């Protein structure tokens, strides 16, 4: 029998293995619901917090998953193709499968926060995550 999975988002630990070498700079990321938490097969639901200053999720894409990002706190810019799109609390951005994108907190004093999700994949590995400019030419798609 399949059961409902319930969790309090504030009780979900941040991912300890996501850092600058994979494009996650000055930020914490929670995978609230995914293949490992809740047994999802086609969806990831998460929260990201970006420290004031130079925090960002660098240019990346996921060939197997669409993504939405709902800005719940602060402001920043969404990196999209050759564009930098200003966003603030209340804005939602959507990225199609395979589209290069990222996010940068533009405030020197305020944290930015987003609720984000992937549709079409239930983990970073199955999403086909790829960093645009990998550190030292390494492949970070796994």
Language-model features: locations:
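Short, conserved beta-strand element in jelly-roll/cupin
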Residues: 47-51, 61-78, 117
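Short beta-strand His + acidic residue motifs that chelate non-heme Fe in jelly-roll/DSBH
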Residues: 57-59, 78-79, 95, 101-108, ...
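Short acidic-glycine-tyrosine-enriched beta hairpin
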Residues: 82-97
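Short strand-connecting beta-turns/loops that link adjacent beta-strands
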Residues: 37-38, 64, 108-110
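Short, charged/polar surface micro-motifs in flexible loops or helix N-caps
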Residues: 37-41, 50-56, 75, 122
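A short, N-terminal "cap"/entry segment at the start of jelly-roll beta-barrel domains
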Residues: 1-43, 58, 128-142
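A short hydrophobic beta-strand segment most commonly corresponding to one strand
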Residues: 45-48, 94, 109-126
């Amino acid at each position: 029998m399949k059961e409902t999975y319930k969790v309090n988002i504030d009780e979900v630990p941040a991912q300890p293995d996501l850092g600058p070498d994979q494009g996650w700079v000055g930020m914490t990321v929670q995978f609230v619901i995914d293949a490992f938490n809740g047994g999802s097969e086609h969806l990831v639901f998460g929260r990201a917090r970006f420290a004031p200053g130079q925090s960002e999720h660098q240019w990346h894409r996921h060939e197997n998953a669409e993504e939405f990002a709902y800005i719940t706190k602060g402001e920043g810019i969404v990196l999209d193709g050759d564009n930098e799109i200003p966003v603030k609390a209340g804005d939602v951005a959507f990225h199609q499968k395979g589209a290069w994108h990222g996010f940068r907190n533009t405030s020197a004093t305020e944290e930015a926060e987003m609720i984000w999700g992937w549709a079409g994949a239930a983990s970073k590995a199955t999403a086909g995550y790829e960093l645009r400019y990998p550190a030292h030419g390494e492949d970070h798609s796994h």
